[in-house]
Swiss-Prot record:
Binding site for Ni(2+) 2: 218, 247, 273
Organism: Agrobacterium fabrum (strain C58 / ATCC 33970) (Agrobacterium tumefaciens (strain C58))
Record text on subunit structure and interactions: Heterotrimer of UreA (gamma), UreB (beta) and UreC (alpha) subunits. Three heterotrimers associate to form the active enzyme.
Gene transcribed to yield this protein: ureC
Reactions catalysed according to its record: urea + 2 H2O + H(+) = hydrogencarbonate + 2 NH4(+)
Location relative to the cell: Cytoplasm
Post-translational modification: Carboxylation allows a single lysine to coordinate two nickel ions.
Every Urease domain range: 131-569
Record: active site: 321
Keywords assigned by UniProt, alphabetized: Cytoplasm, Hydrolase, Metal-binding, Nickel
Family matches, as NCBIfam families: PRK13206.1, PRK13207.1, urease_alph
Domain of life (superkingdom): Bacteria
Record-given protein name: Urease subunit alpha
Textual note on the cofactor: Binds 2 nickel ions per subunit.
Gene3D superfamilies with a match to the protein in the record: Metal-dependent hydrolases, Urease, subunit C, domain 1
Length: 569
């Protein structure tokens, strides 16, 4: 007779299985396990008296014979592709297999071989996600990188050279600074990439930045986002296969949103803070989220719309864009960008999948450690205010969760040409993974892996007899040190710079990898679960936003999950 175990006891031993539901942090979001790749009665688990022991769940296989380097056991995987339970095998810094781990000599159906060289990470009762990607970074200070890593971000793309005033406001890196920044990247356990300045009316200056290692080009209004600059930048980007990100002209000095759309001429472009509070044609830049060639994204200060959103934005904007509260024109500029109507509409546009990406805008009207938190707060607010999505098929929030996790994992990776390496829990991709306790999901990771090695984790007193005594706080782990630091992460650059000998010229230790397929091969339709293109109208007097004729409005939140309950200090 097979042994029977209660569902509760099974979940306590091996984690939830098909049909079980898990609450995400203190939100109203509930996921349900759709599929379990493990085998009942043959589960592997590490520990005293458990399964992964010699001759039992551990085989005699060497690495050469197929044993993986690390196995993550019985994890609940939350990914754009689905919500399911599986063992995950890591090998040579990549995801080697997703399925059933164990010893093929004694167990049936094994797809991940556990051998004597295999390390074990206990995923029972835990959630595993891809590392996050933040595609809107101002490299104002290097300390941002550790802050982002500890929040579950494993790739940062942006521009700048430190607290220079150009970097405080924009993410546009000049050619010499690009090379110097790439040299500095050896010091950081993080996948990194740089954007060059896209504001030029002739090709040569942009080409020099791409050849210096820019993975993308950024058009920013503070440098003059004119129709001529837009057209030239996209023309060069098409030639070199790099993405263009745009922050449009808030003051409408060189044209209106229609002029910008005309200058883009149907070419693929990533529109930053498309709602407009972070910058862009006032009051109607949000209209471009209905264009099939525009990939719209948000920065996290407006995520989600709360009773405090408007008040904090005015001060943020004055500081970030070098404005003076004593100059009336500067105050008028700032006030033109902050509109409660478009911010409220942004919540709903995210929920219906019309906005595709969420990023931070780090220290330049954004919080680098809150990309995940703000994403899930938005999802929670929308469930409370709008109810279940029509796409849901069960008594769960699986589709909504898949839509929202795509906004900071796979979609920015696709938009910026790195989805062949990162962005999802997928065989063959880099093992840049984050393990979460469900009660702390999206807030405080339990473990962050880079290239298959542990880079960060909460850790107690190093002098204690066990790892858990206070003070417990996030600390860098071994993937943040020595040669492993440069072997466990990469720098993304343009293919043209690699062809031009950038790696040899700079002599950096980190591997340089090329971005690819960011021009005609992708569009809004490439944004997984977030590809809707409604017709957007903005009333120029009231700022009311309509999508396909329907008014988009919602109340500001007065209370949010994932907030003070998790941060006592």
């Amino acid at each position: 007779m097979p042994y029977k175990i209660s569902r509760a006891a099974y979940a306590g031993m091996f984690g939830p299985t098909v049909g079980d539901k898990v609450r995400l942090a203190d939100t109203e979001l509930f996921i349900e396990i759709e599929k379990d790749h493990t085998t009942y009665g043959e589960e592997v688990k590490f520990g005293g008296g458990k399964v992964i022991r010699d001759g039992m769940g551990q085989s005699q296989a060497t690495r050469a014979e197929g044993a993986v380097d690390t196995v993550i056991t019985n994890a609940v995987i939350v990914d754009h592709s689905g919500i399911y339970k599986a063992d995950v095998g890591l090998k040579n810094g990549r995801i080697h297999a997703i399925g059933k781990a164990g010893n093929p000599d004694t167990q049936p159906g094994v797809t991940i071989i556990v051998g004597p060289s295999t390390e074990a990470i206990a995923g029972e009762g835990k959630i595993l996600t891809a590392g996050g990607m933040d595609a809107h970074i101002h490299y104002i200070c290097p300390q941002q990188i550790e802050e982002a890593l500890m929040s579950g971000v494993t790739c940062m793309l942006g521009g700048g050279s430190g607290p220079a005033h150009g970097t405080l406001a924009t993410t546009c890196t000049g050619a010499w600074h690009i090379e110097r920044m790439i040299e500095s990247f050896d010091a950081f356990p993080m996948n990194l990439a740089l954007a060059g300045k896209g504001n030029a009316s002739l090709p040569a200056p942009l080409e020099e930045m791409i050849l210096a290692g820019a993975s993308s080009l950024k058009l920013h209004e503070d440098w003059g986002t004119t129709p001529a600059a837009i057209d030239n930048c996209l023309t060069v980007a098409d030639e070199y296969d790099v993405q263009v990100m745009i922050h449009t002209d808030t003051l409408n000095e060189s044209g209106f949103v229609e002029d910008t759309v005309a200058a883009i001429r149907g070419r693929t472009i990533h529109a930053f803070h498309t709602e407009g509070a972070g910058g862009g044609h006032a009051p109607d830049i949000i209209k471009v989220c209905g264009n099939p060639n525009v990939i719209p994204s948000s920065t996290n200060p407006t995520r989600p719309y709360t009773v405090n959103t408007l008040a904090e934005h005015l001060d943020m904007l004055m500081v970030c864009h070098h404005l003076s509260p004593s100059i009336p024109e500067d105050i008028a500029f700032a006030e033109s960008r902050i509109r409660k109507e478009t911010i409220a509409a942004e919540d709903i546009l995210h929920d219906i999948g019309a906005f595709s990406i969420i990023s931070s805008d780090s220290q330049a009207m954004g919080r680098v450690g809150e990309v995940a938190i703000r994403t899930w707060q938005t999802a929670d607010k929308m469930k409370r205010q709008r109810g279940r999505l029509k796409e849901e098929t069960g008594e769960n929030d699986n589709f909504r969760v898949r839509r929202y996790i795509a906004k900071y994992t796979i979609n920015p990776a696709i938009a910026q040409g790195v989805s062949h390496e990162i962005g999802s829990v997928e065989v063959g991709k880099r093992a840049d993974l984050v393990l979460w306790n469900p009660a702390f999901f999206g807030v405080k990771p339990e473990m962050v892996l880079l290239g298959g090695s542990i880079a960060a984790a909460p850790m107690g007193d190093p002098n204690a007899s066990i790892p858990t005594p206070q003070p417990m706080h996030y600390r860098p782990m071994f993937a943040a040190y020595g040669k492993l630091r440069t072997n466990s992460s990469v720098t993304f650059v343009s293919q043209a710079s690699l062809d031009g000998g950038l790696a040899q010229r700079l002599g950096v230790a980190k591997k340089l990898l090329a971005v690819k397929n960011v021009r005609g091969g992708i569009s809004k339709a490439s944004m997984i679960h977030n590809s809707l293109t409604p017709h957007i109208e903005v009333d120029p007097e009231t700022y009311e936003v309509r999508a396909d004729g329907e008014l988009l409005t919602c109340e500001p939140a007065t209370v949010l999950p994932m907030a003070q309950r998790y941060f006592l200090f």
